[in-house]
Amino acid sequence: MKQVITAKLKLHLSKEQKELLREVSLVYRNALNYASKVAFEKGKVSSANKLQKLIYQDIRSKFDLPSQMSCNVPRQVAATYKGLWTKLKQNAEHLQLGQTKKRYKGLDKPPKYLSRTCNLNYKRDYSFVKQEVSLITLQGRIKVPYSGYNKHIKLIKSGKNTVKFGGAKIYYARSTRTYYLLVSLELEIPNIEPDAINRVVSVDVGQRYHAVTTDTRNQTHFYSGKQCNRKATCYEKARKSLQQKGTRSAKRRLVSLSGRERRFVADQNHCLSKQIATPNTLIGLENLTNIRERTKPRKTGKKASIKQRKANHKQAKWSFAKLHSFIDYKAVLNNSLAIKVDADYTSQACPHCGYTSRGNRPNKGLVFHCESCGFKLHADLVAARNIAMRTLLTRQDWESTGSLSATPDGSSVEAKAARLSRFAELRWTAE
């Protein structure tokens, strides 16, 4: 099994070296904008090979970039256009289904690159030499000392024996005026066998409680999102005030505020995922694909009440996918595994008698009260228990069939119906 992580290395540059990196990053950015303009004029090209044939010689002559960086420019621009075309197609589908009235405008003009970054290839553009990293510039190579997270430094020093080096990116942090090197590291990790798993944990994510976890031994943890939500409200008020002012200094402040809020949310998710992804654990997550479309509010914008607008904003800021991705990669590094199970009816099904109804959770509140057997419990914990039972069933299938994704033959709809039918027979007895 392979797992890719990113090592963030702080570059300790002299004044001359800093100027050389500034020069190459600005020239690279200008080359990206030139390539973006050409791609737009030639029919919004999203093929890297086609774009490279159109602009490679121009980039070499006009911007004096090294050959490998001149190849990276059309690849990066083509990838951007490919993403924009995907969004345009999705928007067309949503317009046809009546899910939105807004036309996607991402391809109305060529995308502009503002960040001072450079994409580098291992050995051709950068390499590690003893305690330094060798970086390419327009004036030749420079050797720069670096620092970073101790685990990442150890992996880099161990060399090709334990890690495979991938692409890297030079990144400039304007707030601290510091250059960083973001290096992709591919780790070879032994395949996880069912016998190595000694614990099953389920995770129910939400907005009031960012995560509620439980296992088959009834060890339960509630991770409140109160502090994070309060902080998000403060950021929202500050952002609203600055947007109303509209001055140049207010816009600069908005940029820094956006970065700070993003880093705060990422830090919260990192800390939470670290506590959840314990060693030798099978972690069950809800499959929340297209959850925003399925839970789309009835009223948005000016038609919605103030209360509804606040709820809509809170839902839009909900970063459950990021939390899932953090749990996923941290689990692999800890000899654990995160899998996704169907999220259908996890908050409506009684784990004791199996009765499923919306009435079991009155007004979608915090209390689950079964209309059939009278079982009463915290609604998020009920959801976590249902996820745990589904995860345990998946593990049993894994042990018996040797396949982690054992599904009955038939269409995806039939397969899902069969899975939900099996889930309805599960009962929670670990009291």
Enumerate the language-model features and the residues they cover.
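Stable alpha-helical structural segments in soluble proteins, enriched in small hydrophobic residues
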Residues: 35, 72-84, 381-391
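Positively charged, helix-rich recognition surfaces that bind polyanionic ligands
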Residues: 4-6, 19, 177-431
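Acidic carboxylate diad motif detector
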Residues: 51-175, 225, 313, 317
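Short aromatic-glycine motifs in intrinsically disordered, low-complexity regions
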Residues: 1, 152-153, 193
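Generic structural motif
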Residues: 12-18, 138-140, 147-149, 158, ...
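Long, compositionally biased intrinsically disordered regions
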Residues: 1-73, 81, 89
